[in-house]
Amino acid sequence: MKFAVAIAFTLLVCVFAQEEEEPVTCGGKQCKPNSCCVQNSHGKGKDSPRCHPLGKLNNPCEVEPNENGIYSQHCPCGEGLSCTKVGEPNKLRCQEESGKSDKSKESQGSDESEESEGSKESSG
């Protein structure tokens, strides 16, 4: 029984892994990796869906697509960034994920202190 459950779980994981790797289909075309499908629904008439790159630092962004997997104006953020409310009137923008920038600053600070200690030892 445990063996059957383990096999079923493994198959389920494989199915989900395959779904994530499939490229996004947008307006009859497949989008490249690190892109999403956007269809501007504002203004006169609807634009046809188009592939857009994922958001970069400070780019406008969206968090959730519609029921068809299409975003209304902007892609979500790329890797290492999160879609965060910024400024007035709380527009969503891609920002560094919290903790990442702090960690990099901390590691830079520790490197600098090690270097300065090393230079003191060599001069003394």
Swiss-Prot record:
Top-level lineage group: Eukaryota
Bias type Basic and acidic residues, positions: 93-108
An MF annotation (GO) of this entry: ion channel regulator activity
Annotated coiled-coil segments of the chain: none
UniProt KW keywords: Disulfide bond, Ion channel impairing toxin, Secreted, Signal, Toxin
Ranges for region Disordered: 93-124
Tissues/organs with expression: Expressed by the venom gland.
Disulphide-bonded residues: 26-37, 31-51, 36-75, 61-83, 77-94
Subcellular location field: Secreted
Entry's Gene Ontology cellular component terms: extracellular region
Signal peptide positions (record): 1-17
Task performed by this protein: Probable ion channel inhibitor.
Entry's family note: Belongs to the neurotoxin 32 family.
Protein name: U33-theraphotoxin-Cg1b
Organism: Chilobrachys guangxiensis (Chinese earth tiger tarantula)
